[in-house]
Amino acid sequence: ILTGPNPHIGIQLLDELHLLQEILPEVSNMKGVRQPENFHPEGDVFVHTLLCLSKLVPATEQGMERPSFPLAMGVLLHDIGKTVTFEELDRIRFNLHEKVGAYMTAKICDRLKTSNAEKERIIWLVLKHLYFKDAQKMRLNKLKRLFANEGYPELAELCRIDALASSGDLSDYHFCQEMFSKLSHEEIKPKPLITGHDLIVMGLKPGPLFKDILTKIEEEQLDGNLTTKEAALKEVRTLISQMKTVLK
């Protein structure tokens, strides 16, 4: 149903036959969950989801013969957390709906007996589906980590579809795609300048500190601030010195 033509019609038929509530009650519960009209003039969460699904077939023009199952499920479930995070005080809010949705998605995947790889990808898509809206303010290292994930092309498609089915603003999508096209594979996922072995040689004992130091060096490398092993080792010495000062 989801990866074939007209997946939105398939979901509508399941709903009309009262099967959606039996198979995917979480999706059925989207009906009637209102959204702020300035961001979602199309209607409630269920209407938005159907509109997103209707754009899956045109999405095949983006390089895939047909939508992958994880992408289709990601589109179906990306806003599922809104059903339990709806809040209306000064305005309608769905705080942390992506995290709640990822948790709900894991339960659904277990129930549907998807493969572990499919489950992991679908959860990731639901969890990250809001990332593009902050992309233009992100540090380069965070963007590169996003681009390095094998699921990035599917996430880009999900975010494009999500935008088209709501505000229609594709500026964040175009920004990410432009950045992605400008960066080489080596720039997105470069060989680490240093490893844990280098830290051991410097006299450090393996432990939690290792991860903190290596993560910091990786971030600086991805940001373009460190380009050689010598510079990375110098930065490690600086970090160690700073940590010793704090611990005094």
Residue ranges and their predicted role:
Residues 1-160:
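Conserved, hydrophobic alpha-helical core segments of structured domains
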Residues 64, 68, 107, 163-248:
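Charged substrate- and nucleic-acid-binding regions of tRNA-handling and nucleotidyl-transfer enzymes
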